[in-house]
């Protein structure tokens, strides 16, 4: 009932509502399969089916043989190309923004016929791609989808975490010798680094890429769902880019006054409760998301957009 009503009003919902039971057991892989090449690897890495267990106004509990449930999640990804020296500042700012950003943009309350979180996509994607069996969870092994655990001082902090915490799911090697490429005056593609990084799903992902022989770094913001309308998506994008600029340019960065754990709690609260979430912010304490946005964050976003020109 929800999908036709939304379509009639010109709005899209951030999670596919027509996933059927057979879809959850479809074999992954190939160009048309759920999850691409990684779909083959997730269940073997676990050694068991994937349990999806999400609370909310209604509770959903089911098992899936592959990571197919994550394919129901639709997102809008926002990219910002930055210099190496500015990467850490912008990534930290994006992490701070994630909670308020999601509170405003939550658009995936339904999945598999159940009303769950305001942005169910966050928890659904987290659980559907979790390759850890229970014993590894209790040992503190990190999940493939995660918010992170600390503020950073360099993009290398994140790439070092990739190597330290996450075994390769797709052990493919290229013939490139990066040192030889540099010595020859060419830009190394670092294919192994990029492939491995692509199997780790941070909500703000570091990206190294090469276009036309020129390397660059990007912050890939993966927080927002798609929809509900093009106008909403443009407004959410403007809020993100404006607030990101304002926080990144602040002489006393907000993350020096906000613990990383508090930023993660904001993110999860926003995923569960959307605009009704209560968020922590320095100088305000715990405050409703709408009050925080209206009193503090919209003016900052406006100033940030002005700085962008």
Explain the meaning of each model-derived region.
Residues 1, 7-10, 21, 26-309:
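Phosphate/nucleotide-binding catalytic core
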Residues 12-18:
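Generic short N-terminal amphipathic or hydrophobic helices
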